[in-house]
């Protein structure tokens, strides 16, 4: 699921409008997937490939050469299929999927400059499509004043729109709600510097 140039522009304008009312920063990230782990697919493909000769020996008179060739083909084919993001994620328990997505969101929080901006007064609006995961992560200064539960309305709006295929609308709704919450606790300062780019990162 991708965003058009118009979607990017709309989201950028929403961030600018929200940040005009607060000294806080808003960063948005849309990830196609948070899981890049291949250990489980490799393990499953290897087990099936290793078990294959035993089955072939029991039920066929295949030569060793053909057996080895088929073993390699099965391993490679299974590995390719199991490494497809939807398949790979489907193999994981829900708790593991959420933990991986959360860890990736925290990495994005740090890499997009939110962990180092002034007073950590910024939030990350994060969605991982394959894992069906959405979360808002706040910097230390914001988290000290605004409980995580306060962001749930924005997360719910984000999920509702995204589930119906309107990803950009979901981000815009979340940005507006987050901007209102930030404005209550972090009004604009005399020098309201825009430290971070007003954009959505699609990765």
Protein language model annotation of sequence segments:
Residues 1-26:
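Short, charged cytosolic
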Residues 23, 125, 174:
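Residue-level signature of catalytic and energy-coupling elements of molecular machines
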Residues 37-46:
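Select subsegments of transmembrane alpha-helices in polytopic membrane proteins
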Residues 57-91:
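Transmembrane alpha-helices and immediately adjacent membrane-cytoplasm interface residues
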Residues 94-112:
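Membrane-cytosol interface motif
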Residues 106-138:
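Acidic, Ser/Thr-rich low-complexity segments on the non-lumenal side of membrane proteins
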Residues 140-197:
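A membrane-cytosol interface segment of integral membrane proteins
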């Amino acid at each position: 699921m991708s965003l058009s140039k118009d979607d990017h522009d709309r989201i950028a304008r929403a961030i600018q409008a929200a940040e005009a009312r607060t000294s806080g920063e808003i960063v948005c990230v849309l990830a196609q997937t948070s899981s890049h782990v291949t250990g489980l697919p490799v393990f499953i493909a290897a087990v099936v490939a290793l078990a294959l000769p035993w089955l072939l020996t029991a039920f066929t008179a295949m030569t060793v050469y053909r057996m080895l060739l088929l073993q390699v083909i099965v391993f490679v084919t299974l590995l390719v299929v199991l490494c497809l993001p939807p398949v790979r994620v489907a193999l994981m328990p829900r708790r593991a999927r959420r933990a991986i997505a959360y860890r990736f969101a925290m990495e994005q929080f740090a890499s997009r400059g939110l962990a180092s901006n002034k007073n950590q007064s910024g939030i990350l609006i994060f969605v991982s499509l394959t894992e069906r995961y959405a979360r808002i992560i706040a910097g230390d200064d914001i988290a000290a004043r605004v409980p995580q539960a306060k962001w749930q309305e924005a997360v719910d709006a984000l999920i509702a729109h995204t589930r119906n295929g309107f990803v950009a609308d979901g981000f815009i709704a979340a940005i507006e709600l987050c901007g209102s919450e930030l404005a209550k606790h972090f009004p604009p300062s005399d020098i309201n510097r825009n430290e971070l780019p007003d954009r959505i990162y699609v990765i």
